[in-house]
């Protein structure tokens, strides 16, 4: 922007030179134009009383006048050239200053317009980025996901074969970037201009979590959440770094005390899985959170009484009445179950969490669900951490550890399920307005991607980020013959991904070679002893 301001300034100098040259040309033409009739009458005639000598004297006088005038013009042109050269040197010096950050800052002080142009450019970057409104995207692969972070860890999708899904930032620039974002947020929260005199000071200990993503042609967006002054209150700051100074976009106070979540679970049989699900639901939703409604949509009548019995026992033991049981006939359809459960709600606009029976979530995730949704503006598509087969992971142990010890985010224990879009938080009004699920899809897979694409094609912001409190528990996957070829392929890919990590699968493939090597080593050791 500084360069553009200097270009505008030099263009004005060039225009000034052109005008001066035009003025000089006009003066020259006026000077060279023959005089009027009265002056022509004063010229001596060749046959007049003064004769030829008088005429030559007049010509010599006129020639001397023109010579003096031309010399004057040459001096003015030389002066203009010197001024133009000086201005050009200043322009080149300005270009050099533009590459030096310190000189640039001092240049802002000297050039208020250049500084204003720079600020206008940076704010234009904010408007172009997906900050205030969603951008229509062609496919699910065009969406830019967020990464999430706390004070100690970063939870990232792109790991390759060397990085980890959860890790401390090793690179200094990444650490400094996130630290600067938190410090900028704290500075804003503690600013005397924006806070009340009696407000407590905020510190890094109040920081809960943040998400960020980079649009490579615009900048990096940060959404940081801090503890509020009261229970269920939070402070959220949205910051944007447009490849330059970080800028605060907005500051808002959020009160989530009355934000109810309707957890909708479609189900057919799988009583044991549902029993484990309700144990987690009772601890996280009833005992810890207390702002949750449960909707179970059950297909068929086989084992239905067992499922209803689990619900009734939980209701009596925990004094929990906020649940709905819906029974549907016909074959299982996840999309239909979720659609019916969402439309069955008769209260005010409610936040929906589409969940499966083999999902484990924490109470912290429920707040993350609330923080990343907004009716008419944002929907939340978390990337959950999918557990590998415990029988493979802990095959060399004496016993498989309890579930609580298995749910750790490591490369050896699971992976970010970035190809799954089934677990989602969105307001009922947005779900209805977007058209809900495609009810023509039967069986496993496809309905979640279809709904996700609808939101990508809309003007709503789709928040896509890995979360540390949402886990997919491993279970053996059966791909039925009734599935279409595309569904069957998706099912088999999911089955392969669920078993173990790249290294662990390699150990299984080469286990015979490893065992043979160990036998040889054992034989060598025994032969040396003898």
UniProtKB/Swiss-Prot annotation:
Reactions that this protein is recorded to catalyse = 3-O-(beta-D-GlcA-(1->3)-beta-D-Gal-(1->3)-beta-D-Gal-(1->4)-beta-D-Xyl)-L-seryl-[protein] + UDP-N-acetyl-alpha-D-galactosamine = 3-O-(beta-D-GalNAc-(1->4)-beta-D-GlcA-(1->3)-beta-D-Gal-(1->3)-beta-D-Gal-(1->4)-beta-D-Xyl)-L-seryl-[protein] + UDP + H(+)
Q: Which GO terms describe its cellular component?
A: Golgi apparatus; Golgi cisterna membrane
> What Pfam families would the database entry show?
CHGN (PF05679)
Q: Which residues lie on this side of the membrane: Lumenal?
A: 34-530
* Predominant cellular place of this UniProt entry's protein: Golgi
Q: Which organism is it from?
A: Mus musculus (Mouse)
> What is the enzyme's class at the highest EC level?
transferase
Q: Which residues are glycosylated?
A: 313, 322
- Keyword Glycoprotein in annotation: yes
Q: What happens when the gene is disrupted?
A: Deficient mice are viable and fertile, but decreased body weight and length and abnormal cartilage.
Instruction: Extract one GO molecular function annotation from the record.
Output: glucuronylgalactosylproteoglycan 4-beta-N-acetylgalactosaminyltransferase activity
Gene this chain is encoded by: Csgalnact1
EC numbers on record: 2.4.1.174
Topology in the membrane?
Single-pass type II membrane protein
What residues bind a divalent metal cation, as annotated? 358, 475
In which domain of life is the source organism classified? Eukaryota
What this chain does, per the entry, is described as:
Transfers 1,4-N-acetylgalactosamine (GalNAc) from UDP-GalNAc to the non-reducing end of glucuronic acid (GlcUA). Required for addition of the first GalNAc to the core tetrasaccharide linker and for elongation of chondroitin chains. Important role in chondroitin chain biosynthesis in cartilage formation, and subsequent endochondral ossification. Moreover, is involved in the metabolism of aggrecan.
Supply the name of the protein: Chondroitin sulfate N-acetylgalactosaminyltransferase 1
The cellular location(s) given in this protein's UniProt record come to: Golgi apparatus, Golgi stack membrane
- Which BP terms from GO are recorded? cartilage development; chondroitin sulfate proteoglycan biosynthetic process; chondroitin sulfate proteoglycan metabolic process; endochondral ossification; extracellular matrix organization; UDP-glucuronate metabolic process; UDP-N-acetylgalactosamine metabolic process
């Amino acid at each position: 922007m500084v360069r553009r301001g200097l270009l505008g300034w030099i263009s004005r100098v060039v225009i000034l030179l052109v005008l001066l040259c035009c003025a000089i040309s006009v003066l020259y033409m006026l000077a060279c134009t023959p005089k009027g009739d009265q002056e022509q009458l004063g010229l001596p005639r060749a046959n007049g009383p003064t004769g030829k000598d008088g005429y030559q004297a007049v010509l010599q006088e006129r020639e001397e006048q023109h010579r003096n005038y031309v010399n004057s013009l040459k001096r003015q042109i030389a002066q203009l050239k010197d001024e133009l050269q000086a201005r050009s040197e200043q322009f080149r010096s300005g270009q050099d200053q533009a590459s030096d950050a310190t000189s640039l800052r001092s240049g802002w002080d000297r050039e208020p317009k250049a500084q204003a142009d720079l600020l206008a450019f940076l704010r234009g970057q904010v408007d172009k980025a997906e900050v205030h409104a969603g951008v229509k995207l062609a496919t699910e692969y065009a969406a830019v996901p967020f990464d999430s972070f706390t004070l100690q860890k970063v939870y990232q999708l792109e790991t390759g074969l060397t990085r980890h899904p959860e890790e401390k930032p090793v690179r200094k620039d990444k650490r400094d970037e996130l630290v600067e974002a938190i410090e900028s947020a704290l500075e804003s929260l503690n600013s005397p201009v924006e806070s009340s005199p009696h407000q407590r000071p905020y510190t890094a200990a109040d920081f809960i979590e943040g998400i960020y993503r980079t649009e490579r042609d615009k900048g990096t967006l940060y959404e940081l959440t801090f503890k509020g002054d009261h229970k269920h209150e939070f402070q959220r700051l949205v910051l944007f770094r447009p490849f330059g100074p970080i800028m605060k976009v907005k500051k808002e106070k959020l009160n989530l005390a009355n934000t109810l979540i309707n957890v909708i679970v479609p189900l057919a049989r799988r009583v044991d899985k549902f029993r484990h699900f309700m144990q987690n639901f009772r601890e996280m939703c009833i005992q810890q959170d207390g702002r949750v409604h449960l909707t179970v949509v059950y297909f068929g009548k086989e084992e239905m009484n067992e499922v209803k019995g689990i619900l009734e026992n939980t209701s009596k033991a925990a004094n929990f009445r906020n649940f709905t049981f819906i029974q549907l006939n016909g074959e299982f359809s996840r999309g239909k179950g979720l659609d019916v459960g969402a439309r069955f709600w008769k209260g005010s606009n409610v936040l929906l969490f589409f969940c499966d029976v083999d999902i484990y979530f924490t109470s912290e995730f429920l707040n993350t669900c609330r923080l990343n949704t907004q009716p008419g503006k944002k929907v939340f598509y978390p990337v959950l951490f999918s557990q590998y087969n415990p029988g493979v992971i802990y095959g060399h142990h004496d016993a498989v550890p309890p579930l609580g010890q298995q749910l750790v985010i490591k490369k050896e224990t699971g992976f970010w399920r970035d190809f799954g879009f089934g677990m989602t938080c969105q307001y009922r009004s947005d779900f209805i307005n977007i058209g809900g699920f495609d009810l023509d899809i039967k069986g496993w897979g496809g309905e979640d991607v279809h709904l996700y694409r609808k939101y990508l094609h809309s003007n709503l912001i789709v928040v896509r980020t890995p979360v540390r409190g949402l886990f997919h528990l491993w279970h053996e996957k059966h791909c039925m013959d009734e599935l279409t070829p595309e569904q069957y392929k998706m099912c088999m890919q999911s089955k392969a991904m669920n078993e173990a990590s790249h290294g662990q699968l390699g150990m299984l493939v080469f286990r015979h070679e490893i065992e043979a090597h160990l036998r040889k080593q054992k034989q060598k050791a025994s032969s040396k002893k003898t």
